[in-house]
């Protein structure tokens, strides 16, 4: 078993832990580091397509905010969370994408006058929608059977 702390190891935001065990690789949360340039978030040490699934502890953006970016970059596995967490994530991720798009548009309008290069949003509403389609809601304290021998207890 290998545990790699990828986020929130030097501050509170940006929670992300990668666990490799029983031939599987998964993330526990994939959150946005808040209060800094969004493009400076911790990169993953593996390609998103090499991650089997994601387990979400709760819906806060510092635990879920990079899931649309994960989907945009090729992750196609399942994202497991309790049903209320899935519902909240749908709202929060779409809202975050809207903010990303609005801020990029604003920076581009402002930067155009100064001759700055255009910026792209970190992710779009379409990316948030793609991430939301990967969610699988589970009952609180239910056993999630991923594959043999991987089983997890839902606690979010």
Question: What is the meaning of each model-derived region?
Answer:
Residues 1-2, 125, 136-138, 147:
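Short Pro/Gly-enriched beta-strand edge/turn motifs at strand-loop
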Residues 144-156:
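Single conserved hydrophobic/aromatic residue that forms the stacking wall/gate
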Residues 37-88, 94:
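Active-site metal-binding motif and surrounding structural segment of the metallo-beta-lactamase
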Residues 4, 26, 55, 80, ...:
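Hydrophobic/aromatic beta-strand patches that form the interior of the parallel beta-sheet core
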Residues 3, 29, 58-59, 89:
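Divalent metal-coordination and catalytic microenvironments
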Residues 90-135:
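Acidic/polar short surface loop at catalytic or gating sites that assists cofactor/ion binding
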Residues 1-49, 53:
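Conserved beta-strand hairpin/beta-sheet module of binuclear metal-dependent hydrolase folds
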Residues 8, 30-31, 83-84, 138-141:
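Fold-independent oxyanion-binding glycine-rich loops
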